[in-house]
Amino acid sequence: MNLILTLKRPFIWLSRIRHRCGYGVHSPFAFELITCLIYEKTPYYAYKELEAEEEKQKRNHGKGWKSESRKVTRLLFRLVNRVQPDTIVDAGVPSSSSLYLQSGKATADYTFASELSELFLEAGVPVDLLYIHKAKDPSFVEEVFRICAARSTQQSVFVIGGIHYSGAM
């Protein structure tokens, strides 16, 4: 049975390849998100400057600075650039993602919180973009999500990293 599946697998892949770029998606929003944001390969104007700044921050902060993958940081930059949020909340460990989130829209109010006690949000201000990346602490993720979900709008975007880290996530 394994041999048959092994022989069929390339043909299954070939039959599905036309849907790879989102052409099987019916929602216009999801189609644009897949084709123009996730699969985007064009280098943006700020990538080189951000990578240089990231290297400088790594040298200055040492082990207290988490370097995220280029793929994730660039996706976050493109997401902020596309959505143009007024309020960005970055909850988790200090990392290179903060540079990319802030430079996507320089005029946005940026809030970083590594602990719940640091999460200060003004009353009545909605959270337009939330990035949670502290997978080792599921209670922190749940509490930040609960706080920010109460302040979300229809245009709010939540990005949660490490959801497969543990069963509790």
Where in the sequence are the language-model features?
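A short alpha-helical cap/connector motif
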Residues: 1-129, 135-159, 163-169
